[in-house]
A protein has these predicted regions:
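Intracellular juxtamembrane helix-capping segments at the cytosolic ends
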Residues: 47, 130-143, 341-354
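C-terminal ends and interior cores of transmembrane alpha-helices
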Residues: 97-112, 309-322
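Juxtamembrane intracellular "pre-TM" segments in multi-pass secondary transporters
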Residues: 2-23, 202-241
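Helix-loop-helix hairpin linking two adjacent transmembrane segments in secondary transporters
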Residues: 112-117, 145, 155-201
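Hydrophobic core of transmembrane alpha-helices in multi-pass small-molecule transporters
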Residues: 34, 115-130, 327-341
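C-terminal membrane-cytosol helix-exit motif in multi-pass small-molecule transporters
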Residues: 187-212, 407-412
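Cytoplasmic helix-loop-helix junction between adjacent transmembrane helices
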Residues: 121-158
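Helix-to-loop junctions at the C-terminal end of transmembrane segments
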Residues: 75-88, 174, 285-299, 385
Length: 417
């Protein structure tokens, strides 16, 4: 009786400790997401237009968002290794640190009028996005069973204020030097985000998650190959990664070229900033509701709903004339909602499909594939708009959602973990 009682007391103490740490983790991640969201929002609103202005080429303009997304993909690799070897705090601090350096380089490039240097800066700028994406997984390390999507969605939702405010601030930076000021402001907020997670994310949630298994140390040798093995063994993990990748690729491709499309209709940076802010609100604002639906009704149905929303977004935005700012905004809000369904439900499904000690590897692999696909999508989007049209890009994205939707219909027969 004494042994059983002692064991129950220890379990209760451990549960209370994990719950207390989880509350702190969510608070710190929320602060980091708000700050990081401001910087990323600034870059999203201005990047395409600045690159096009510096180069005089719409193709190079499309490469701006592609560079940032490619940077996020590349930085996800060392970030995943840091998570596996040192914990979430090191990985997130590294990502925001790279974003700080990249924003500073982009500011200097805008000041000196060098578009190659600007694109190089945006590669590093993508580190902040990589940190933001990794933060959503950090929120699930200590989640109670059946609550991963809700905890994850809180961190995604935390990006709303910053990400909506960022594009709006992009049109108010004349006093800081116009385009240069946009990236100087991003430099400052990324530095604050790095400081917040470095100081505040103690104890590390991934280390605490290993307490229940009797191992306080994080297994040190976890590569992306480990993530591939997880995908090979788990059908639900494969479905999750595919849905995440398609959702993010479609979102980046359409969103990155919408500012150029609206610019052809005479829209200024302020108007574009409002449209992008509405889009980002669609991405983040309803994510807690998306997370609740995913936990209550299953991940796959929410993923399927996300593909339907992405298809509707492609139709609405694709039919918008360059002067139709309102219609384009509606299309981008739908695009954001579809993305939210894909990222929240897909990330939760992936997390629950892998053991805790293998999660950093498969999560890092997912972010690599997600951002790599989006980078390719951004390149293709720029070429399609330059050689064909914005409606042609929308039609291609509509076709992209059809096979993924079909796969998800079939995947509903799979038992979720």
């Amino acid at each position: 009786m004494t042994t059983v009682g002692s064991g129950q007391a220890w379990t209760a103490q451990q549960g209370a400790y994990r719950a207390a740490v989880q509350r702190r983790v969510l608070a710190v991640l929320t602060a980091g997401q708000v700050l990081g969201g401001i910087g990323v929002g600034l870059g999203v609103a201005a990047g395409t237009l600045v690159a096009r202005e510096l180069s005089g080429s719409e193709v190079v303009g499309g490469l701006a968002q592609t560079s940032a997304v490619l940077g996020a993909a590349l930085i996800a690799i060392p970030a995943a290794r840091l998570s596996a070897g040192s914990g979430r705090r090191s990985a997130l601090s590294f990502g925001y640190g790279m974003g700080t350096l990249g924003a500073l380089v982009a500011a200097l490039a805008a000041a000196f009028g060098s578009w190659p240097l600007f694109l190089a800066g945006l590669l590093l700028f993508g580190g902040a996005s990589a940190a933001g994406y990794a933060a959503r997984y950090s929120a699930t390390d200590l989640s109670r069973p059946g609550h991963a999507a809700r905890d994850l969605s809180i961190v995604v939702w935390a990006s709303t204020g910053g990400a909506v405010l960022g594009p709006l601030l992009a049109g108010k930076t004349d006093a800081l030097g116009g385009h240069t000021g946009v990236y100087l402001l991003a430099t400052a907020v990324f530095a604050l985000a790095a400081l917040a997670v470095f100081v505040g994310l103690r104890p590390d949630p991934l280390r605490v998650a290993h307490l229940g298994s009797g191992r306080e140390e994080i297994p040190p040798d976890r590569s992306l190959r480990t993530g591939l093995r997880v995908l090979g063994r788990s059908p639900s993990a494969r479905v999750a990664v595919m849905a995440i990748t398609v959702s993010h690729t479609a979102m980046v491709a359409l969103m990155s070229m919408t500012p150029v499309h609206l610019d052809h209709g005479g829209a200024g940076l302020g108007t574009v900033g409002v449209v992008i802010s509405l889009h980002i609100a669609g991405m983040y604002a309803l994510s807690p509701l998306v997370g609740w639906f995913a936990d209550q009704f299953g991940h796959v149905p929410v993923l399927l709903g996300g593909q339907v929303l992405l298809a509707l977004a492609a139709v609405v935005a694709g039919l918008a004339a360059p002067e139709s700012t309102a219609q384009a905004a509606v299309g981008l809000v739908l695009l954001g909602l579809g993305w939210s369904c894909g990222i929240v439900a897909g990330s939760a499904l992936l997390t629950e499909s892998a053991p805790v000690d293998l999660r950093p590897s498969v999560q890092g692999l997912s972010d690599l594939l997600m951002n790599g696909g989006a980078a390719l999508g951004g390149v293709v989007a720029g070429v399609i708009v330059a050689t064909l049209s914005y409606p042609a890009l929308s039609a291609l994205l509509l076709l992209l959602t059809l096979p993924m939707g079909t796969l998800l219909l079939l995947a509903r027969r799979l038992a979720e973990p």
